[in-house]
C-alpha cells in the first residue's frame, strides 16, 4: 500500500479538487459512511457466504479472441465488439484498438489474499489476453486497479489511460511516464481513431494510509466509427448523469455499475433502480449492467443486482443486454436471456 509520505501532484483548483488539501471531492456531497456501519456490514461478510456466492462457478463461454488479433485498421469503420470478464473488466475491440477496462485477474479485491476473494475464476490468465493497446482505468480501488496486472503489462506496448492522480500508482509499478495518459473530467484523449473522454462520477478513492481522495474517480465515454459507448466505473446516483446525457447526446450501449450496494453506503454505489435511471438519464439506447459476477463486496445475494435491474429495465422500457461471461457481443447483439437465473436454478436442483 502507498503511504502518506508518497509525493502527490498538485492540480489546478476546480469544483472537485482543492489544491490546498491536495484532495478531490464530489460537487454533489456524499453522506459519510460511519465506521460502525462499515464494520457491521463488512465483518459478517468475512464468515458468511450463503447466497452471496453462487453454489458453483457460473457458466462461461470460451472467449473468441480472433477479432482482437486482426491487424489494426480503425479507418474501416468496424463495429466495436466486447467480451465481459465479470465485475468491471471488459475487453473491447474499438477503433481498431484492443482496450481493456479496469482489469482485475487476481484472487482478491484487496491488499490481503483472504479478504474479498473472487467467487468466479478468471476466464483466462492475464498472460493469455490478446495484445493490448489501451488499459483504461476508472479509479484506484482494489477491484478496479490491480497492481499485479499493471506490473505485468507495464513495459509492453499498451497505453495506460486514467483519471488524475492514478499516474502515481502506475509510475510506482513500473509504467513509463510516456505510456501514461491522464485526464480530468470532460478532458479528451485521442488514440488513433478512438476518442476517450473522462466524465464525472460520484464516488471516492483510497488504497492505503493517508491517500484518501488523492486521486480522481471517473467514468469514460468511448467513441469511434460513429459509435458511442459509456463506461461508468463506480458511481452513486447523482445529477451528473443528466449532464453527461446533455453533453454527449446518448449512447449506443452503456456499461453501468450494478452491484455491491448497501443502505449503509448509499452514496458510494447505485441500487438497481438507480442503475436503470442513470442509463435513462444519459440517453442509453441499451444498458449492460456490470460490477457483478466476480466479487461479493456487499451483503446482497450474488445475482440480486442483475435480477432487480433487469426487472426495472423492463418496467421502464429500456432494452437490456446481458451477455454470458466470455461471450463476444456488440451493441446490436441479442440478449442471452436470464442465464444467471438458469444457473441458480440448476445449482439448487443439483
Protein language model features and the residues they cover:
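Active-site metal-binding loops of divalent metal-dependent hydrolases
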Residues: 103-105, 140, 201-203, 233-235, ...
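Catalytic core of the metallo-beta-lactamase
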Residues: 89-95, 190-251, 266, 270-274
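Divalent metal-coordination and catalytic microenvironments
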Residues: 92, 102, 139, 146, ...
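Cap/insert and terminal regions of metallo-dependent hydrolase folds
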Residues: 2-27, 129, 134, 159-168, ...
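Acidic/histidine-rich helix-loop elements
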Residues: 105-122, 205-211, 262-268, 296
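Metallo-beta-lactamase
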Residues: 1-128, 159, 163-231, 252-259, 308-328, ...
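Active-site metal-binding motif and surrounding structural segment of the metallo-beta-lactamase
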Residues: 114-161, 181-182, 249-255
